[in-house]
Amino acid sequence: MKITWLGQAGLLFDNGKVKIMVDPYLSNSVEKVEPLNYRRVPVKEEFLSVSPDVMIFTHDHLDHYDPETAPIFLERKEKRMTVLSPSSVWQKARAFKAHNNVQFNRGTSWTEYGFRFTAVKAEHSDVHAIGVIIEDLMENKVYYITGDTLYNNRIFGDLPEKIDVIFLPINGVGNNMNETDAVRFFRACGARWAVPYHIGMFDGKTTDIFDDENKITLEIYKEREL
């Protein structure tokens, strides 16, 4: 699977046949509300032209369901996307009727294109926020995107025994884990590899603060095989 970090919590999964996009933030909309949270990373506009088969929004915050970025994808009608989002986002996304908008709350699974997607608990200020398990049924690989979350023991009951790669926030503000709790969470969930992210967009942090030998560091906009 080729994976590209789009900055903040944005991810693009591409196996050559199916494209899955998660939480794209490709604007500067947050700065308009919170001036200190301006982009430190420029938008790479080529990613606005990507045509995902599946779009996932984990919760209704500007840097995840972005009111400037999301409509660029949702207004297109040439291809019907599957859009997976919890109730807080689904209420907005379903206004774009060209796509299959699935209400994707905790405990819900959706199987399509050789993948199974399962919404799991996240502990965040948006009570509808979710994490997502992405199972590649052909390659027998499991990816876990925690979404924005704090360390909470109740999350672990939602998780599968096997996790190949976990993507988890380490910015430590806005009801997200800091690097210390993120390392604890990684080790507790039993994942093989950890990809720390949700940094560098509104701050000067790097993945160096995540101290574990099984860390994988992604560079923004650079594709990596995982």
What are these regions (language model features)?
Residues 1-2, 77-83, 141-143, 193:
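Short active-site oxyanion
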Residues 22-23, 52-63, 83-87, 143-148, ...:
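Active-site neighborhood of phospho(di)ester-bond hydrolases with catalytic His/Asp-centered motifs
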Residues 18-56, 60, 67-72, 149-161:
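Pre-active-site segment of Zn-dependent metallo-hydrolases
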Residues 123-188, 204:
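Active-site-proximal loop/helix segments of hydrolase catalytic cores
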Residues 1-45, 128-147, 165:
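Conserved beta-strand hairpin/beta-sheet module of binuclear metal-dependent hydrolase folds
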Residues 42-109:
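Active-site HxH/HxHxD metal-binding segment of metal-dependent hydrolases
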Residues 9, 28-29, 61-65, 90-93, ...:
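Active-site environment of divalent metal-dependent phosphoester hydrolases
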